[in-house]
């Protein structure tokens, strides 16, 4: 191999070593309290869309009820956006004002 090609190859390797992949930004999916959505419906949403068991869903629901909001999980932006749309659509289809939002983690 010529010295020029060897030098170029070594520079590419050095550059590749400097470039490190960063983890994607993460977002919290949050349920916000309201005075109208039944607690049972909130638990149902947490089980249906976030795969929580009854105990965990009840804990998060109580956090929503007493603290004003509760974190459902932390996800990449695309997954968080999808979950927010799914929960808000499901809530409206069931005539509940439950609001799901996302926040930078």
Curated annotation (Swiss-Prot):
<dbReference type="InterPro" id="IPR022935">
    <property type="entry name" value="ClpS"/>
</dbReference>
<dbReference type="InterPro" id="IPR003769">
    <property type="entry name" value="ClpS_core"/>
</dbReference>
<comment type="similarity">
    <text>Belongs to the ClpS family.</text>
</comment>
<dbReference type="GO" id="GO:0006508">
    <property type="term" value="P:proteolysis"/>
</dbReference>
<dbReference type="InterPro" id="IPR014719">
    <property type="entry name" value="Ribosomal_bL12_C/ClpS-like"/>
</dbReference>
<dbReference type="Pfam" id="PF02617">
    <property type="entry name" value="ClpS"/>
</dbReference>
<comment type="subunit">
    <text>Binds to the N-terminal domain of the chaperone ClpA.</text>
</comment>
<comment type="function">
    <text>Involved in the modulation of the specificity of the ClpAP-mediated ATP-dependent protein degradation.</text>
</comment>
<protein>
    <recommendedName>
        <fullName>ATP-dependent Clp protease adapter protein ClpS</fullName>
    </recommendedName>
</protein>
<dbReference type="GO" id="GO:0030163">
    <property type="term" value="P:protein catabolic process"/>
</dbReference>
